[in-house]
């Protein structure tokens, strides 16, 4: 299933995470709460911890086999006692309803051969007043120098994993099909993202 490729992408993207965390913090607008990062492309959560954005941290890990990698990443980041790794699936089984203030799901719509993003599940786990940042890209604050440094290798790895490009129109259709009962804003600054506020 390409777990080694996914792990390489996650490590390659390390320099992006602090800038992406800044973008997320700007949208989230607070510093407390439970933060969860969903899926195989988790990593920005370590920058959220460093920046003090949130007071409880969870990685909802899938596909199976990525959890051990994230536990090792937490050790390397000195965050072992601060982060909980939960083996789950795109439906977020094992994650309680209305338990999350901030949800981040990178790579959500671009890897249909690996998983289908479940926006209804993301919405389900958000607390009232919670925010989800779902999609993909470098975020609006990542400098061009960082992007150009990892761009080609990241592109190659993504293609090997079956990455597809989707348009904003297709994304809007997917949002409609998810039947989440709130307005979801699509932003294209620094990637293609869906911002869900509950």
Regions found by a protein language model. Name each.
Residues 12-33:
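Conserved alpha-helix/loop element of class I SAM-dependent methyltransferases that forms part
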Residues 36-37, 41-92:
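Class I SAM-dependent methyltransferase SAM/SAH-binding core
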Residues 91-103:
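A short acidic, Gly/Pro-enriched loop at the edge of an enzyme's catalytic core
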Residues 101-116:
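A short SAM/SAH-binding and catalytic strip from SAM-dependent methyltransferases
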Residues 116-131:
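A short glycine-rich, Lys/Arg-flanked "PGG" loop and its adjoining helix->strand segment in the class I
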Residues 133-158:
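Conserved class I S-adenosyl-L-methionine
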Residues 160-179:
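Short alpha-helix
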Residues 174-198:
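Core SAM-dependent methyltransferase catalytic element
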